Curated annotation (Swiss-Prot):
This is Small ribosomal subunit protein eS1A. HAMAP family: Ribosomal_eS1_euk. Component of the small ribosomal subunit. Mature ribosomes consist of a small (40S) and a large (60S) subunit. The 40S subunit contains about 33 different proteins and 1 molecule of RNA (18S). The 60S subunit contains about 49 different proteins and 3 molecules of RNA (25S, 5.8S and 5S). Keywords: Cytoplasm, Ribonucleoprotein, Ribosomal protein. It comes from Trypanosoma cruzi (strain CL Brener). It is found in: Cytoplasm.
Length: 261
């Protein structure tokens, strides 16, 4: 029987093996910088491919969203802020620094479940307001009623008219307060609990409240990008040479161990 050629078997070329390039040698490290109203400015690092031809690294970095814990950003406020997560969006790249702006803030789910109780009324309000510099924020507020000092009943349910009154007052106070400030001042009011304490103080005379929290804040709409406003929000940017000084070494094959007799 005549044996034909096996077309699946191809002769190996005389070319040498292709040299593999270390993946990390094509990348650069950047510092993620928070606005100046936070105590810890450089809260993280990120990595991106270097600029090659028409692929500019800054175009891939703009629009990225990074999350951090509020207790890590404000060290002096203690661990009470550990249950809140803050997100920032990159708006501009300046050297190896990523200039970010506030994107959203949210309580952790376990903290929300911890606040829930039986035999009380849960009051929720969703408020949409616009800051003085054109940012549209949507806030979600949650409050819980409590017993009065001379109450004998084990439940502390609030009447519907009182719930509506509390919700109406929360809406008016938030819109009046945040419509007069810019985005950085609004974030300070939210992260420092200034607005929350003000709401609790004004709503307690209507119905006794055990707790009132701003559960979630998110930026719904943003104005046209203004580079000067972003630079004013950041002020002096702390320098960090760690990203520039980082050296990525090429991977080398380890020498084969000699066989022992």
């Amino acid at each position: 029987m005549t044996l034909g050629k096996n077309k699946r078997i191809s002769k190996g070329g005389k070319r040498g093996k292709k040299k593999t390039q270390e993946t990390m040698s094509r990348k650069e490290w950047y510092d993620v910088v928070a606005p100046k109203n936070f105590e810890v400015r450089q809260f993280g690092k990120t990595i991106c491919n270097k600029t090659q031809g028409t692929k500019i690294a800054a175009d891939y970095l703009r629009g990225r969203v990074y999350e951090s814990n509020l207790a890590d950003l404000n060290k002096t406020q203690g661990d009470d802020d550990a249950y809140r997560k803050v997100k920032f969006v990159v708006q501009e790249v300046q050297g190896r620094n990523l200039l970010t702006q506030f994107h959203s803030m949210e309580m952790t789910s376990d903290r929300v479940y911890f606040l829930l109780r039986k035999w009380c009324t849960t009051i929720e309000a969703a408020v949409e307001t616009k800051t003085a510099d054109g940012y549209t924020l949507r806030l979600f507020v949650i409050a819980f009623t409590k017993k009065q000092s001379n109450q004998l009943s084990k439940n502390c349910y609030a009447k519907t008219r009182l719930v509506k009154w509390v919700r109406h007052r929360i809406t008016n106070l938030i819109r009046q307060r945040l419509s007069k400030v810019n985005i950085n001042e609004a974030v300070t009011l939210l992260t420092r609990n200034i607005l929350r304490d003000r709401l609790a103080k004004r709503c307690n005379p209507i119905v006794p409240l055990r707790d009132l929290r701003i559960r979630k804040v998110k930026v719904v709409r943003t104005p046209r990008f203004d580079a000067q406003a972003l630079l004013n929000a950041h002020g002096e940017i702390p320098a960090s040479a760690e990203g520039e000084a980082r050296v990525v070494e090429e991977a080398q094959e380890a020498p084969a161990a000699e066989a022992t007799a």
